[in-house]
Amino acid sequence: MAPNLRKSHPLLKLINNSLIDLPTPSNISAWWNFGSLLGICLLTQILTGLLLATHYTADTTLAFSSVAHTCRNVQYGWLIRNLHANGASFFFICIYLHIGRGFYYGSYLNKETWNTGIILLLALMATAFVGYVLPWGQMSFWGATVITNLFSAIPYIGQTLVEWAWGGFSVDNPTLTRFFALHFLLPFMIAGLAFIHLTFLHESGSNNPLGIPSNCDKIPFHPYFSLKDILGFIVMFLPLTTLALFSPNLLGDPENFTPANPLVTPPHIKPEWYFLFAYAILRSIPNKLGGVLALAASVLVLFLTPLLHKSKQRAMTFRPFSQFLFWTLVANLFILTWVGSQPVEHPFIIIGQLASLTYFTILLLLFPIIGALENKMLNY
C-alpha cells in the first residue's frame, strides 16, 4: 500500500499530529474552543497589523496624522484599524476565558503548559501596552509615561532603567521608535511561544470537563473538533465585525483623539479595559514600590496555582465550595475592573483596597483551605 503523505512527510506529519489525527477527549466542551480562538486572534492581529504598519510612521511629529491618514485615505484603512484595535480586546477576552477554564478544570496541573501559558499572557500584555502607545494620542503618551515610570520604583537601578527604556529624559521620539519595533517583534515571539505551549500540551493530551484520564475514550481531532473550532471562529468574528463596523470606539478612550501633548495632563489617566483589574491593584497600595510589587504579583500569582492545589480531585466539576469561591473570584475581578476605571476618590479607594485584598486571599489562602476541607468531607 502506498504510504500516506500526510503521515510520512516531515512537515505534514507535524500538522497531522497536531490538527488531524490528534487523539482528543470526546467530551471536551465549548470551553476548550478558546485555544484555537486565540490562535485565530493572533493571525488576525498579525495580518491587520502588517497592513497598518505599511502606512504607519514611527515619528512623534507624524505618528498621529499617519494613523488619521490610514483611516481617511487608505482603502478600507478605517476597517483594518478598527479590526486591529478591537481584535486586541477580543484577544484578551479569549485569553481571560481560557485561563479561567484552565483554573476551573485544574488544567494547571500540566505544569509546563500552564507556565508557558502565563509567559504568553505576559508577552500579550507587553504587546498590547506598546501597541497602545503607537497612535500617539494623549492617553498613549500619558499611559506610556505612567507605566514606564513604575520601573523607577526598583531600588538603586530604577531611574537609570527608565531613562534607558525611554532613550532620553522623557517619553519622546526614541521611545516611540523602539515601541514600534517591539510591537512588530513581540507577536512573532508569541507565535513561537504558542508553538511551545502546544508541544507541551500534546505531550500529555488535553484535560476534560470531568478532570479524569480520558485515554479510554479518544476521538480524532478532524473532523469533529476542526468543525467545532470553525463554528467558534464564526461565533467570535460575528461580534468582532459588529463592533468594528457599528461602534468601533466603544472600548477606546476619547482622550486618544487628541494628539499627544506633554504639557497637558488628562484628568483621568487609565489604561484600556483589559488592564483595569491590575491597575486597580496597583493603585490600591499608597506606596510606589508596594504598588508595583502588587501589580506584578497580580499576574505572577498564577505561577503558584499548581502548588496550591490541595484537592484530590482535579476539576471543580464536583466541588461546590470551590465553585462558589471561583465565581466569587470572577465577581471580584469585575469589581476591580470597574474600580480601575473610576477616579481616585473616597468610596473607590477603599473598595479597590478590599477587592485587591480579597483577590490575593482567595487565590493564596482560601482555595487550598477549601480544597483540603472538601477532601475531609469526602473522607479522602
Swiss-Prot record:
Keywords: Electron transport, Heme, Iron, Membrane, Metal-binding, Mitochondrion, Mitochondrion inner membrane, Respiratory chain, Transmembrane, Transmembrane helix, Transport, Ubiquinone
A Pfam cross-reference name: Cytochrom_B_C
Subcellular location: Mitochondrion inner membrane
Binding of heme b b566, residues: H98, H197
Topology with respect to the bilayer: Multi-pass membrane protein
A single Gene Ontology CC term: respiratory chain complex III
Main location: mitochondrion
Cofactor dependence: heme b
Assembly behavior: The cytochrome bc1 complex contains 11 subunits: 3 respiratory subunits (MT-CYB, CYC1 and UQCRFS1), 2 core proteins (UQCRC1 and UQCRC2) and 6 low-molecular weight proteins (UQCRH/QCR6, UQCRB/QCR7, UQCRQ/QCR8, UQCR10/QCR9, UQCR11/QCR10 and a cleavage product of UQCRFS1). This cytochrome bc1 complex then forms a dimer.
Other information: Heme 1 (or BL or b562) is low-potential and absorbs at about 562 nm, and heme 2 (or BH or b566) is high-potential and absorbs at about 566 nm.
Described purpose of this protein according to its UniProt entry: Component of the ubiquinol-cytochrome c reductase complex (complex III or cytochrome b-c1 complex) that is part of the mitochondrial respiratory chain. The b-c1 complex mediates electron transfer from ubiquinol to cytochrome c. Contributes to the generation of a proton gradient across the mitochondrial membrane that is then used for ATP synthesis.
Family membership: Belongs to the cytochrome b family.
Protein's name according to its UniProt entry: Cytochrome b
Species for this entry: Alle alle
The encoding gene: MT-CYB
